[in-house]
């Protein structure tokens, strides 16, 4: 039996009455966003909206982005990335479980010094992927050129965020490159491995 979105009790400030709200709404009230699935356009739009709202509500308070994602759409992920860089609030990224592909890119894109992972988290980087299907050769060539351009752009950002050379990033992302939390810290994808909530 599938598990739906859990509801939790919530008491409005100054009220004695509780009401039930979904867990993600409750977390957002604590400035917590949970990226726990594939990055799609719809999910990216919701995360961007949350980031913009929370930043406008109190730009001096940090926003916590928990990540357990296999990755997903590059364009959707770049919308989240650009918004993270645009807003005034610090975005503290925390890997729980797996941050792969675009999930790892977003993890590394948190506020410097505030990119974290739990001890048993796994992080994986690789090059962007695209499909060809049954199409004309010129269309395939156009898509291949765009994927190569995006790959270069992502690699340049990762090199900047991690302190690695562009050549090392290109080599390491040529195939799936898995890291433990400690290895990701040494690589520069995160700043610290945490065991308790001291952030």
UniProtKB/Swiss-Prot annotation:
The record's annotation in InterPro entries points to:
ClpP, ClpP/crotonase-like_dom_sf, ClpP/TepA, ClpP_His_AS, ClpP_Ser_AS
Q: What class of enzyme is it?
A: hydrolase
Query: According to its record, what are the GO cellular component terms?
Result: cytoplasm; endopeptidase Clp complex
Q: What is annotated as the active site? A: 101, 126
Pfam families, A to Z: CLP_protease
Name the PROSITE patterns for this protein. CLP_PROTEASE_HIS, CLP_PROTEASE_SER
Subcellular location(s): the record lists: Cytoplasm
Parts forming coiled coils: none
Q: Which GO terms describe its molecular function?
A: ATP-dependent peptidase activity; ATPase binding; serine-type endopeptidase activity
Documented EC number(s): 3.4.21.92
**Key words, A-Z:** Cytoplasm, Hydrolase, Protease, Serine protease
What is one process in the GO biological process aspect for this record? protein quality control for misfolded or incompletely synthesized proteins
Reaction catalysis annotation: Hydrolysis of proteins to small peptides in the presence of ATP and magnesium. alpha-casein is the usual test substrate. In the absence of ATP, only oligopeptides shorter than five residues are hydrolyzed (such as succinyl-Leu-Tyr-|-NHMec, and Leu-Tyr-Leu-|-Tyr-Trp, in which cleavage of the -Tyr-|-Leu- and -Tyr-|-Trp bonds also occurs)
The primary location reported for this protein is cytoplasm
Its function?
Cleaves peptides in various proteins in a process that requires ATP hydrolysis. Has a chymotrypsin-like activity. Plays a major role in the degradation of misfolded proteins.
According to the record's subunit comment, the protein's assembly and interactions are: Fourteen ClpP subunits assemble into 2 heptameric rings which stack back to back to give a disk-like structure with a central cavity, resembling the structure of eukaryotic proteasomes.
Assigned protein family: Belongs to the peptidase S14 family.
Which protein are we looking at?
Answer: ATP-dependent Clp protease proteolytic subunit
Q: Organism source for this protein?
A: Rippkaea orientalis (strain PCC 8801 / RF-1)
